[in-house]
Amino acid sequence: MNTSELETLIRTILSEQLTTPAQTPVQPQGKGIFQSVSEAIDAAHQAFLRYQQCPLKTRSAIISAMRQELTPLLAPLAEESANETGMGNKEDKFLKNKAALDNTPGVEDLTTTALTGDGGMVLFEYSPFGVIGSVAPSTNPTETIINNSISMLAAGNSIYFSPHPGAKKVSLKLISLIEEIAFRCCGIRNLVVTVAEPTFEATQQMMAHPRIAVLAITGGPGIVAMGMKSGKKVIGAGAGNPPCIVDETADLVKAAEDIINGASFDYNLPCIAEKSLIVVESVAERLVQQMQTFGALLLSPADTDKLRAVCLPEGQANKKLVGKSPSAMLEAAGIAVPAKAPRLLIALVNADDPWVTSEQLMPMLPVVKVSDFDSALALALKVEEGLHHTAIMHSQNVSRLNLAARTLQTSIFVKNGPSYAGIGVGGEGFTTFTIATPTGEGTTSARTFARSRRCVLTNGFSIR
């Protein structure tokens, strides 16, 4: 090969190298959707490094844009979620989506604390962790993704979502929408990512990945336990079995309406919903009558047995009936459905009935009569199983309300209202769908997904 031919070859090679697209970083097949877990997390890590350089106003801009652009999509997302998962109803899912979008706090949750004295000044501020691995459930898929995205992006993190395979389509659609909104606000791709095929194995890979700084797990006890074994910091939102106490001083009309509204909400899918009703015997009959006026159907003992056999075979929830309507449950049990579809099924049962002793996620509320308030509180403590999740009580006796709250030690305690008031729906306070009871964070917000840092200036800077 002569000099002229060699120069020609070199020019050709250089030309090809300059015009051939780089193979890294790996590009997603959709907005934030990758083929492999490693590709997705690596992309999210690179996005985080750039996001760290952005001012707080950029985070606020992303959240503001999310609130504006996702609002008209909340109803379609709710309908798609109900259709894909086969659980819950689109009307209540819309309300949950709206609460998550409107009531999840942003950067304003990252409050700064300063202490000054003769020795100088100490500043406490919240900083991001990095890439957070967030596991979302099929029971609350879109609302969890919206809620977690706002909280985690506000805290300065990037996010790898591990959605439930049963809510794959709607979850991936929403993740792509949020990724695109974030990109348009800050010019950074892949702040929110996932994989095209979310599986249990993919979740395991994510939990073991060295670039995942924190795990936020919204799901059952099994997936939370798996996360605990990862050796990483875990913010774990596990199961609950919320009891509802009604004593003889309660406003029975309001209590009946609140209980029906809470226990029927999204067909009882929320983990904070009333799962059992414990009522003082002297007012039990009147309360049940009032509940029927608000749309509850009281089952006979025979029909209760039929329903239990179908919905709780061997004492365990029939997954095919989780999150189904009361009418669908009746049909499955061979029980006639009234002309006016009931909002909630109720039945008088014993304290050891399977409907009472564990979380079922179905719109059937077991009612247990007890002799007095002390007995009600003792049973509620047993039913709650030490999960420290949620409890509800209806009473006009402030001392009893206070005693129940102190005794049950739940992350959420709702007094004289529907259960969903505890997450900012029809009640005060911010909204969250990640209630970290096993790991103790309780109702999570942006500051939950940030680490507290201490900056010290010595020798002065106190002007007192």
Swiss-Prot record:
Induction / repression: BMC production is induced by growth on 1,2-PD vitamin B12 medium.
GO biological process, alphabetically ordered: propanediol catabolic process
Subcellular location: Bacterial microcompartment
Spans annotated as Targets protein to the BMC: 1-18
Function: A CoA-acylating aldehyde dehydrogenase required for optimal 1,2-propanediol (1,2-PD) degradation. Optimizes growth in the bacterial microcompartment (BMC) dedicated to 1,2-PD degradation by minimizing propionaldehyde toxicity. Directly targeted to the BMC. NAD(+) and NADH are regenerated internally within the Pdu BMC by the PduP and PduQ enzymes, which reduce NAD(+) and oxidize NADH respectively, although there must also be cofactor transport across the BMC. The 1,2-PD-specific bacterial microcompartment (BMC) concentrates low levels of 1,2-PD catabolic enzymes, concentrates volatile reaction intermediates thus enhancing pathway flux and keeps the level of toxic, mutagenic propionaldehyde low.
EC number, as in UniProt: 1.2.1.87
InterPro entries documented for this protein: Acetald_propionald_DH-rel (IPR012408), Ald_DH/histidinol_DH (IPR016161), Ald_DH_C (IPR016163), Ald_DH_N (IPR016162), Aldehyde_DH_dom (IPR015590)
Protein name, UniProt field: Propanal dehydrogenase (CoA-propanoylating)
Additional comment: Bacterial microcompartments (BMC) 100-200 nm in cross section are formed during aerobic growth on minimal 1,2-PD-B12 or anaerobic growth on 1,2-PD-tetrathionate medium, but not during aerobic growth on glucose, anerobic growth on glucose or pyruvate-tetrathionate. BMCs can constitute up to 10% of total cell protein.
Self-association state and partner proteins as the record states: Interacts with BMC shell proteins PduA and PduJ, which target this protein to BMC. Interacts with PduQ, probably via the N-terminus of PduQ. Interacts with PduK, probably with its BMC-containing N-terminus.
Keyword annotations of the record: Bacterial microcompartment, NAD, Oxidoreductase
Family the entry assigns: Belongs to the EutE/PduP family.
Name of the encoding gene: pduP
Domain observations: A short N-terminal, probably helical sequence targets this enzyme and foreign proteins (tested with GST, MBP and eGFP) to the BMC. 10 residues give poor localization while 14 is better and 18 is better yet. The cargo is only detected by Western blot in broken shells, strongly suggesting this protein is normally found inside the BMC and not on its exterior. This N-terminal sequence interacts with the C-terminus of PduA, and possibly also with PduJ, to encapsulate PduP into BMCs. PduD and PduP compete for encapsulation in BMCs.
Primary location class: other
Any one Gene Ontology cellular component term annotated for this protein: propanediol degradation polyhedral organelle
Consequences of knocking out this gene: Significantly impaired for growth on 1,2-PD/CN-B12, loss of propionaldehyde dehydrogenase activity. Releases decreased amounts of acetaldehyde when grown on propanediol.
Impact reported for residue 7 to A: Substantially decreased protein levels in BMCs, no change in enzyme activity
GO molecular function: acetaldehyde dehydrogenase (acetylating) activity
Catalytic activity, as annotated: propanal + NAD(+) + CoA = propanoyl-CoA + NADH + H(+)
Pathway in which the depicted protein is active: Polyol metabolism; 1,2-propanediol degradation
Mutagenesis or variant effect for residue 14 to A: Substantially decreased protein levels in BMCs, no change in enzyme activity
